[in-house]
Design a protein with these regions (language model features):
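His/Asp/Glu-rich mid-to-C-terminal helical/loop segments that flank catalytic regions of hydrolases
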Residues: 156-157, 222-239, 268-270, 310-319, ...
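Active-site-adjacent substrate-binding region
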Residues: 217, 224-227, 231-246, 383, ...
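Zn-dependent metallopeptidase/amidohydrolase metal-coordination segment
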Residues: 8-11, 330, 337-352, 357, ...
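Substrate-recognition/cap regions that form aromatic- and gly/pro-loop-enriched pockets
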Residues: 335-424
Length: 480
């Protein structure tokens, strides 16, 4: 069976059509055109705002004209991650998906189910002539994964809906009614390289980690390639370490899976000590990271790098950076309140750069952890920039659409849904600032390992999610 044969057929075919269009964050030109043409070909009012968001409006079905207008929202962009041994160009190639047991996944890359399943769901609704629904305002935003630019720059006054259904939650028995805000902390310092003569050159590679979403997966105690690499570099300090290059992590909102460093030390005894350290690190992560690999290669071509003194400073700075769960919520059991992820560590030509992302459902705690991270680099004279701050979404337990969907879920599936906030940056908080008073909820099919090449979406959950989506459109409340 092929992906296009799965049920509901229309939804899966729209997903495959979407995945044939390259759509990495900040490179959404082709998918914007694709969605715009999709709406125009259906004869529906279609508008692309100056930022690149696409809005398609569909009149209510006969008999549903007096129901409240519903905004249905998903983001067009996807995280572009691939395995080190996968040859793939996200700018020119479509995602190659396939069925793996109960799941759909991709060949060596992210699948794009985040948030492609949401986009495909909206497309299926827009194209349907049989689904009963109120007036629909389909909102396709851009650049959610690298700054939520589309949500931030969405024009005011072009949407009239009172209810917003966000389709970016990744568990089919969960309703999200709140989310974390976030802020980026970027640091830089330029060192003067020195000529390296003598010593022994090595390339150190940390790979095989699971990675994942630095918000939703931060509590799973997965390894951070940048922090693991730094432990190796710290060991090398005893052998007159001189760092030439570091390239760790890839995306600001993904847990780093790989890191590569080129270094010079003054003794091969370092290798014996590294074997012991590698064994210790693997034992620490034996359950959460069973495929962790620490690889060492001899190289003779290292001619320039940092001095030993500057190498010590870099290692100590990275060591001092907090990474992981900072604080758990005191109001919702099991919810991460505040966290930080050291996403990128780069050293090249003497330029030392880090990128990290702090998240919190509390604005005060978000600012606190961001300043904590920044202080680690201010102490070495680095430039520190905090940017891209976006608000969280405060839960509303009195939400009308929440009550409707909880009741509907119980009747359809004979069980209670999980109602909770998530430790990730949904666009709902920003959209609520642009359009105050929206009654919002987020739901979706079950997606595992988003933001990594292990991303997969559960087939049965897609059908479950779709059936719930169709039914809720029938029971949207009437206008006041």
């Amino acid at each position: 069976m092929k992906v296009r044969d799965l049920l509901p057929v229309e939804l899966w075919n729209n997903f495959e059509d979407l995945n044939a269009v390259p759509r990495p964050s900040k490179k959404e030109e082709r998918v914007i055109e694709f969605i715009k043409n999709f709406g125009l070909n259906l004869g529906l009012p279609t508008y692309v705002d100056p930022c690149g968001n696409v809005i398609i409006k569909k009149p209510a079905s006969k008999g549903s004209e007096n129901q409240k207008t519903v905004i249905i929202q998903s983001h067009l962009d996807m995280v572009h991650q691939k395995n080190a041994d996968t040859e793939f160009d996200f700018l020119t190639q479509g995602i190659q998906s396939y069925i793996d047991g109960d799941w759909v996944t991709a060949k060596g890359t992210t699948l794009g189910a985040d948030n492609g399943m949401g986009v495909a769901t909206i497309m299926t609704l827009l194209a349907s002539s049989t689904i009963q629904h109120p007036s629909i305002e389909a909102l396709f935003t851009i650049d959610e994964e690298t700054g939520m630019t589309g949500a931030f720059e969405l024009e005011k006054g072009i949407l009239e809906g009172e209810i917003l259904l966000n389709l970016d939650t990744e568990d089919d028995d969960e309703f999200s009614i709140g989310c974390a805000g976030g802020i980026d902390t970027n640091t830089s310092k330029l060192y003067k390289e020195e000529k390296i003569s003598g010593g022994i050159g090595f390339e150190i590679i940390v790979k095989g980690l699971k990675g994942g979403h630095s918000g939703m997966d931060i509590h799973l105690e997965r390894g951070n390639a940048n922090k693991i690499m730094n432990r190796i570099l710290a060991l090398a300090l005893s052998y007159n370490l001189k760092i030439s290059q570091i390239d760790g992590g890839s995306l600001r909102n993904a847990i780093p899976r790989e890191s590569v460093a080129k270094i010079v030390v003054d003794s091969k005894d370092f290798l014996n000590q590294l074997d012991d350290l590698a064994a210790e690190i693997k034992s620490e992560f034996f359950k959460s990271e069973p495929d962790l690999i620490i690889e060492v290669n001899n190289i003779d071509s290292i001619t320039h790098g940092l001095s030993n003194i500057d190498s010590i400073e870099v290692v100590n700075a990275i060591y001092s950076v907090f990474n992981g769960v900072y604080k758990m919520s005191q109001s919702i059991d099991g919810l991460v309140e505040t966290s930080s992820s050291l996403a990128r560590v780069i050293l090249n030509g003497g330029s030392f750069i880090t990128q990290s992302l702090q998240r919190s459902s509390l604005e005060s705690s978000k600012q606190d952890i961001a300043k904590t991270i920044g202080a680690s680099f201010l102490n070495i004279g680095a430039d520190v920039e905090h940017s891209g701050s976006y608000p969280g979404w405060a839960p509303n337990t009195d939400s009308e659409i929440l009550d409707i969907m909880v009741s509907l879920y119980k009747n359809m599936f004979n069980s209670d849904p999980k109602v909770q906030a998530c430790h990730a940056g949904l666009e709902c908080g920003i959209l609520n600032e642009r359009y105050p008073g929206l009654d919002m909820i987020s739901f979706g099919p079950t997606i595992k390992n988003p933001h990594s090449p292990d991303e997969k979406v559960n087939i049965a959950s897609v059908q479950k999610f779709w059936s719930l989506f169709v039914e809720v459109l029938k029971v949207i409340p009437f206008k006041n």
